[in-house]
Swiss-Prot record:
The active site is at C447, H599. Keywords: Cell membrane, Kinase, Membrane, Phosphotransferase system, Sugar transport, Transferase, Transmembrane, Transmembrane helix, Transport. Residues 3-414 form the PTS EIIC type-1 domain. Residues 425-506 form the PTS EIIB type-1 domain. This is PTS system glucose-specific EIICBA component. GO terms for molecular function: D-glucose transmembrane transporter activity; kinase activity; protein-N(PI)-phosphohistidine-sugar phosphotransferase activity; protein-phosphocysteine-sugar phosphotransferase activity. Disulfide bonds: none annotated. Its EC number is 2.7.1.199. Its main location: membrane. It is an enzyme of class 2 (transferase). It holds the Pfam family PTS_EIIC. The chain crosses the membrane at residues 16-36, 63-83, 89-109, 126-146, 170-190, 211-231, 273-293, 303-323, 329-349, 355-375, 382-402.
C-alpha cells in the first residue's frame, strides 16, 4: 500500500517538472523587461530609455507575465502529459476539460463580469471566463483527470459506425464529460477548501514565520532523495499566502506574488520560501565540493577535480544541486542531514535579515542577478556575506565529518580487486554478485551498450566492483542500475538470466600454465582510417548526444549523426561484427581493424525491432555505401526519445580522432579521420 502510494506520488512529482520547466523562460523575459524599465538600470545605461527599447521591454514583460497569469492551465496540460507518458492527446484533453470545468462552475455559481473582481468572493477571470478561482490546484486536478481518461480510454474500441471516434479521439470526448460532472462538486466544496488553505497559510505565516521558513527549507531538502520535493513546495509557491495587485486581483502563492510584485515594481513582501536557497547553492555546496576534493586520495584527485568542479559550477550558476548532493547522499547520509539543517537555517537567517529574493528556476547566480540584483528592490547584497560564512561552515563541517567517520565520498572508495581478473565465463556470475545477488534482481535487461537492471535494494549493489569488472561507468536512476559494459552487455544479460534460472553453474577454477597461454596475433595498424557518413543527415558533436553514456564517451569517442531519411549505409569497407537482436544497433570492423558502433536513435532497444529492417548479417563482408539497414524514421521519431545516432569508435586507444568541419552531409561524405601517429 505504502509503496504503491509512494510510487504514485513520485509520478506526480515528476509530472510537475514539465510545467515548472517553463517558468525560467518566462522569468527571464519578465526579469529583463522589468529591469530595463526600472530606474536603477536606466541610471547606469541611459540609452535604454529610448522609446523603441522601452517598447521592447514592455513586450518582454508582458510575454513573461502571460505565462504566470495562466499557470493553472499550463499545469493542467503539463501534468496530463507527464502522467500519460508524454502523449499530446492528454494535453488536448486537459485543455478541453479545463475550459469546460471553469465555464460550468461560472454558470452554476452565476459568476458575471460584474462580480468577478470581488476579491472576497473567490472568483476570477480565467482565459476570459468569469468563474471560481481554483488556482494551480485546479489545474493539477484537471491534469490528473485527463491522464486518467487517456490511460483508460486511449485504446477503446467502438462499433464500426462510430469507428472514427475510437481510440485516442475518444479521450477528449470523455474528458469533456467528466470535467462537466466534476465542475458541480468543485463549485460546491472548493470555496471551503480555499478558505481552509487560506486559514492554514495565514496561521503558518503569521503565528511563527521564522519556524515555518526553517521547516520548509529543512523538509524540502530531505524530500529530494525521494523525488517528492516538487509536491511539497508546490502549495507554498502557488497557493499559500495572498496579495492584491494594482488591478484588484488576488494573487496566491509565494512565487506568483513575488513575480507579480517584481512586474508591478511594488514593495517586495514575498520570497520567504525561496530566498534561503541562494547562500546554499551559490556558496555552501561548492565549498562542500572543495572539501570532498581535498579529502580524496591523491591518486584520485584529478578525476574528482573534474567531477566536483563541474557539479560545483552547476550548483553556483543554475542552482541544480542533484549532481553534487547525490555524490555523498548514499555514502554519507549524515552529511546530507547536516546539509538539510543548514538549508533550513539559511531560510531563517535571510528572513530575519528581511531579505526578499525569489527565482523562477532555482537559487543560482543567474536567478540571483536577474531577480535580485537588477530589480534592486531588496537587500540582495546580504546574500554575499551570509554565503561566505556558509562556505566556511560547509567546507570545515564536511571535511571534518568525512575524515572523522571515513566516509567513502568520491575519490575515497575502496578498490575492488577481487573481480578484476574475471574470465569471460566467470564474468556474469561476478556481475550478478556485484548487483546484490539473484534475490536483489527485480528486472533484467540490456541493450548493445549497457546492462539495465532494476534492483530491489540499491544499497546492496557494489558500484566499485562493477567498475572493476570492466564497466566503464555505472548510472543510477532510482533503483535502476545501468552498467556500461559495451557490446558484451547483451551476452552478460543472457548469461545472468540463465544463471538465475539454474541452467548454468559457475565453472570450476583451473590452473593455467605458461605452455597453455594463448597465442597473441599482432595486427599492424593503418596510419589513417577514413569514416564516411552512414546516410544523409547532420553531424553533431558527441557531447550534444542526449544520452550521457555516449556524451561522456563511456563507450568511446566519435560523433552524433541525425539521419534525414531511413537509409543507413556502411561508412567504410569492412565486416559486420555484431547486429543486436532488436536491430537498433550494428557493430562494424574496418579492414584496418577499427571498430565502429552505429547506435540508431536513443533508447531504441525498447522498440523491440519495430521500425528496423536489416539487410546484412553477422560476419557479412560490406563495402562503403552498401545499405546496411532501412529504418522507419517517422515511427522512431514518435516512439523513441531521439533519432540522434551515435557513431562510436570503441577501440580508438592511442590514435587521434579528427572530425571534419561539416554539419549537413550526404551519404559517403567524409566525416572522420582516425590517425595513428606511431
Amino acid at each position: 500500500m505504502f509503496k504503491k502510494l509512494f510510487g504514485q506520488l513520485q509520478r506526480i512529482g515528476k509530472a510537475l517538472m514539465l510545467p515548472v520547466a517553463i517558468l525560467p523562460a518566462a522569468g527571464l523575459l519578465l526579469a529583463i523587461g522589468t529591469a530595463m524599465q526600472g530606474e536603477s538600470l536606466q541610471h547606469y545605461l541611459p540609452f535604454i530609455q529610448n522609446g523603441g527599447i522601452q517598447s521592447v521591454a514592455e513586450m518582454m514583460t508582458g510575454a513573461g507575465g502571460i505565462i504566470f497569469d495562466n499557470l493553472p492551465m499550463i499545469f493542467a496540460m503539463g501534468v496530463a502529459i507527464g502522467l500519460a507518458s508524454g502523449d499530446g492527446v492528454a494535453a488536448i484533453a486537459a485543455f478541453v476539460g479545463y475550459l469546460v470545468m471553469n465555464k460550468t462552475m461560472g454558470a452554476f455559481l452565476h459568476v458575471s463580469p460584474d462580480n468577478v473582481n470581488d476579491a472576497a468572493s473567490g472568483y476570477a477571470s480565467v482565459l476570459g471566463i468569469p468563474t471560481l478561482q481554483t488556482g494551480v490546484f485546479g489545474g493539477i486536478i484537471i491534469g490528473a483527470l485527463a491522464a486518467w481518461c487517456y490511460n483508460k480510454f486511449y485504446n477503446i474500441s467502438l462499433p464500426s459506425y462510430l469507428g472514427f471516434f475510437a481510440g485516442k479521439r475518444f479521450v477528449p470526448i470523455m474528458m469533456a464529460t467528466t470535467s462537466f460532472i466534476l465542475a458541480f462538486p468543485m463549485a460546491w466544496i472548493w470555496p471551503s477548501i480555499q478558505t481552509g488553505l487560506n486559514a492554514f497559510s495565514e496561521g503558518l505565516l503569521d503565528s511563527n514565520t521564522g519556524l515555518a521558513v526553517f521547516l520548509f527549507g529543512f523538509i524540502k531538502r530531505l524530500l529530494i532523495p525521494f523525488g517528492l520535493h516538487h509536491i511539497f513546495h508546490a502549495p507554498f509557491w502557488f497557493e499559500f499566502g495572498a496579495w492584491k495587485n494594482a488591478a484588484g486581483e488576488m494573487i496566491h502563492g509565494d512565487q506568483r506574488i513575488f513575480i507579480e510584485q517584481i512586474r508591478e515594481g511594488s514593495k517586495l513582501t514575498a520570497g520567504k520560501f525561496m530566498q534561503g536557497e541562494f547562500p546554499v547553492m551559490m556558496f555552501g555546496l561548492p565549498a562542500a565540493a572543495l572539501a570532498i576534493y581535498h579529502t580524496a586520495k591523491p591518486e584520485n584527485k584529478k578525476v574528482v577535480a573534474g567531477l566536483m568542479g563541474s557539479a560545483a559550477l552547476t550548483s553556483f550558476l543554475t542552482g541544480i544541486t542533484e549532481p553534487l548532493e547525490f555524490s555523498f547522499l548514499f555514502v554519507a547520509p549524515v552529511l546530507f542531514f547536516v546539509h538539510a539543517i543548514l538549508d533550513g537555517l539559511s531560510f531563517l537567517i535571510l528572513y530575519l535579515l528581511n531579505v526578499h529574493l525569489g527565482y523562477t528556476f532555482s537559487g543560482g547566480f543567474i536567478d540571483y542577478v536577474l531577480l535580485g540584483v537588477l530589480p534592486n528592490k531588496t537587500q540582495w547584497w546580504l546574500v554575499i556575506p551570509v554565503g561566505v560564512v556558509y562556505a566556511f561552515i560547509y567546507y570545515f563541517v564536511f571535511r571534518f565529518l568525512i575524515l572523522k567517520f571515513k566516509y567513502k565520498t568520491p575519490g575515497r572508495e575502496d578498490k575492488q580487486a577481487q573481480f578484476t581478473n574475471s574470465s569471460a565465463s566467470e564474468l556474469p556470475f561476478n556481475v550478478l554478485k556485484a548487483m546484490g545477488g539473484e534475490e536483489n534482481i527485480k528486472h533484467l535487461d540490456a541493450c548493445i551498450t549497457r546492462l539495465r537492471v532494476e534492483v530491489k535494494e540499491k544499497g546492496k549493489v557494489d558500484v566499485a566492483g562493477l567498475k572493476a569488472l570492466g564497466a566503464s561507468g555505472v548510472l543510477e536512476v532510482g533503483n535502476n542500475m545501468q552498467a556500461i559494459f559495451g557490446p558484451k552487455s547483451d551476452q552478460i544479460k543472457h548469461d545472468m538470466s540463465l544463471i538465475m534460472k539454474g541452467e548454468i553453474t559457475k565453472p570450476q577454477e583451473t590452473t593455467v600454465t605458461e605452455e597453455e597461454s594463448e597465442e597473441v596475433v599482432h595486427i599492424e595498424r593503418a596510419s589513417e582510417v577514413n569514416i564516411y557518413a552512414p546516410g544523409n543527415g547532420q553531424v553533431i558533436p558527441l557531447s550534444e548526444v542526449p544520452d550521457q553514456v555516449f556524451a561522456q564517451k563511456m563507450m568511446g569517442d566519435g560523433v552524433g549523426f541525425i539521419p534525414a531519411d531511413g537509409k543507413i549505409v556502411a561508412p567504410f569497407d569492412g565486416t559486420v561484427k555484431t547486429i543486436f537482436p532488436t536491430k537498433h544497433a550494428i557493430g562494424l570492423e574496418s579492414d584496418q581493424g577499427l571498430e565502429l558502433l552505429i547506435h540508431i536513435g536513443i533508447d531504441t532497444v525498447k522498440l523491440n525491432g519495430e521500425g528496423f529492417e536489416s539487410f546484412v548479417e553477422t560476419d557479412d563482408r560490406v563495402h562503403k555505401g552498401q545499405v546496411l539497414m532501412q529504418i522507419d524514421l517517422d515511427y522512431i521519431t514518435a516512439h523513441a526519445p531521439s533519432t540522434v545516432t551515435p557513431l562510436i569508435i570503441t577501440n580508438l586507444e592511442d590514435r587521434q580522432l579528427s572530425v571534419e568541419d561539416v554539419k549537413d552531409v550526404t551519404a559517403e561524405q567524409l566525416i572522420i579521420k582516425v590517425i595513428d601517429d606511431k
